[in-house]
Amino acid sequence: MSYTPMSDLGQQGLFDITRTLLQQPDLASLSEALSQLVKRSALADSAGIVLWQAQSQRAQYYATRENGRPVEYEDETVLAHGPVRRILSRPDALHCNFHEFTETWPQLAASGLYPEFGHYCLLPLAAEGRIFGGCEFIRQEDRPWSEKEYDRLHTFTQIVGVVAEQIQNRVNNNVDYDLLCRERDNFRILVAITNAVLSRLDIDELVSEVAKEIHHYFNIDAISIVLRSHRKNKLNIYSTHYLDEHHPAHEQSEVDEAGTLTERVFKSKEMLLINLNERDPLAPYERMLFDTWGNQIQTLCLLPLMSGKTMLGVLKLAQCEEKVFTTANLKLLRQIAERVAIAVDNALAYQEIHRLKERLVDENLALTEQLNNVDSEFGEIIGRSEAMYNVLKQVEMVAQSDSTVLILGETGTGKELIARAIHNLSGRSGRRMVKMNCAAMPAGLLESDLFGHERGAFTGASAQRIGRFELADKSSLFLDEVGDMPLELQPKLLRVLQEQEFERLGSNKLIQTDVRLIAATNRDLKKMVADREFRNDLYYRLNVFPIQLPPLRERPEDIPLLVKAFTFKIARRMGRNIDSIPAETLRTLSSMEWPGNVRELENVVERAVLLTRGNVLQLSLPDITAVTPDTSPVATESAKEGEDEYQLIIRVLKETNGVVAGPKGAAQRLGLKRTTLLSRMKRLGIDKDALA
C-alpha cells in the first residue's frame, strides 16, 4: 500500500498535530496524546506504541485504553514475540480483528494487555531506514479502515516515529549523563577513601578512618574489619558503631572463628550479602547487632579483603535498611574493599616491621650493656697527661646533662671516642648513639639522611625513610665534621636544636624528637662565621659546652702508652706475638710532631707490627720518615745570623702584630702549619697576645 500525506487537514492541522506530539516529555505521555488525537479524529478508540530493543531483545509497550487507563509493560517473551516481531520482518501495515489476533498470538491475548476489541492495526515506526517498533491503533467495532483513514494513520505514525526517536535519544542521553555523574561521584568517593586510609599504618586508626568514610558516604552505622588472630581459630575484630553521630563507639575483641559468617567468607573468598533474623543461628558477637537495633531485620554485607591470592580479612558492614546495599553501591563497596585490603596489608607489614625493630632495639640494648660492662668508663681513651686529664674531667662534668657539646680538635685526635664517652656516661646510654659524618655525604642527600623522607618526596624516593634524628630519639646524635654542613641546611638543624621538632622531606607533619646533640669539627668555626661560611646563631647553639682536644704533640707523655696499646691490640688482631718495645723506639716516637695525631701514630705502629719478625717491635727511622712529613723549621722567613728558633718566631710575630693564621700571618711567613707554630710557641713559652 502506498501512503500519501494527510492533505485534507491542511498545513495548519498537520502543524498542530506535530506540535502537540512534540511537546510530550516521555513515551507514556506521547501514547496518551496520540490516543486523544486519533479518538478526536474518529480514527480509532485508542492507540499505543511498541518499541523494540535490539540489544536486549525486549519489547516496551505504552498505551492508553478507551477508559483512559495508561498501560506500560516490558518483556522479552510474550510481548517481544507478538505483532512487533512480525512487523520487524515484514514492514507492512498489519491489521486484524480480535479473533485473528487471538489465534495468532494466544499468549499475548491472554495476558490482559489487550481487552477484546473490534479491529487492530499496527504500522511500522522507522527512523533513518531502521524499523525500531510499531504504532498500533484499536477500534472497538469490527470495521476496517478505509484507504483515506490508513493514510491519516500513517501520517500520525510518521510523526510519532520522529517524536519517539527524539524522546528515546533524550532519555538515553539523560541515562548516559546520570551514569557519567554517578561514575564521577563514585570515583571521587573512591579517591577520598583511598587517600584517607592508605596513610594509616595503625590498625585501630585505619578501622576508625574506614568507618568514618563509609558512614559518611553510605550512611552505614556498623563497620568492622575482621582479621585472623595469631592464636589458632581466633578472630580479631575491630568495630565501630555509630549509635551517636558525633561519638562513635570503637571496640576491639577476640572471638572464636567457628560458626561465624566471617568463617564462611574466609572459606569462599566471595562477598556475602544476607538478611539476618534474631532467630538465625549466629555467633555471640554477631547477635550483638540485635542488641543495638532491636529486633529489626539486619542486612549484613561481608566483603573479602584480598592481597593477591591471600585472604587478609573481612570488611563487615551492617545496617537495618536493605536499600543501602543496592547493585550500584555493592559495586563501589567492592572497589573500596580492594583499597582497604591494600591499607590493611601495609598496616600489618608496618606492625611486623615495628615488632622486629623493637626486638632489634632490645638486642642492641643488651649488647650495649655488655660492652659497657667490658669497657672502662672511658672505653678506648688512653692518656695520663694533664691535657687529657682536663678533657676527661670536662666529659664527666657535662655527660649527665642534656646540653649540646662541641668537640674541637685536629683530625685524628679522637673526637668520636670523646663523643662516645659522653654518651656512655649519660642517662641515654641505654640506647645506641647514632653518628653521622657531615663531610662524607653529598649535600643533596645530607638533608634526607638527617631528617628522613616520605615516599615520592623526590626522584628515587620509592619508600619512606627514617632519618638520623628519628633514630636517635631518646639517645645521642653525634655529628662529625659539622663545619662541613651546607649553609642552606644549617637553619633546619638550628630549628631541631631550638624546638626539638622537624619535618621529613615531602611531609608537613611535625615529628617531635628528644635528642642530645654532640658535634665535632676540625675547622675554625669562629673564622667560618666571620667569613659567612657558617651561621652565627647555629654556632652559638653548638658552642654551649666546647671541649678542645689537644693534638698529640702537646701531650708527648701519652705517646708511650698509646704505642703499647696499639702494638698489643694490632698484634693480637694479626696473630703476632709481640711482647716488647725498645725504649729507644718509644723515645723516637715521642719526639715526633705527629701532624696526623693519634690516627697517624696508630698507622705507623700497624706498619711496624706488620714488618716485625720476632717478639720485639722493630721500627727503623726510614719507616717513620716514610709516613711522617719532615717538620724541621724550614721557613719562608729565614733566621738572621745568630738568631735561634725562639728569636725568629718572636720577630715574625711582632712583624705580623701577633697574627698567627691567614695569608699574612706568622705561620704563612714561617712556612709552618698554624697548629705546628702554636705547638712550638707553647713549647718555647711564647705568648702571642703579649707581643701584639
Curated annotation (Swiss-Prot):
Keyword DNA-binding among UniProt keywords: yes
A Gene Ontology biological process annotation?
A: phosphorelay signal transduction system
Q: Which residues bind DNA?
A: 663-682
Annotated positions binding ATP: 409-416, 472-481
A GO term for molecular function: ATP binding
Sum up the protein's function in the record's words: Required for induction of expression of the formate dehydrogenase H and hydrogenase-3 structural genes.
Stated name of the protein: Formate hydrogenlyase transcriptional activator
Question: Where does this protein come from, organism-wise?
Answer: Salmonella typhimurium (strain SL1344)
- Gene (UniProt): fhlA
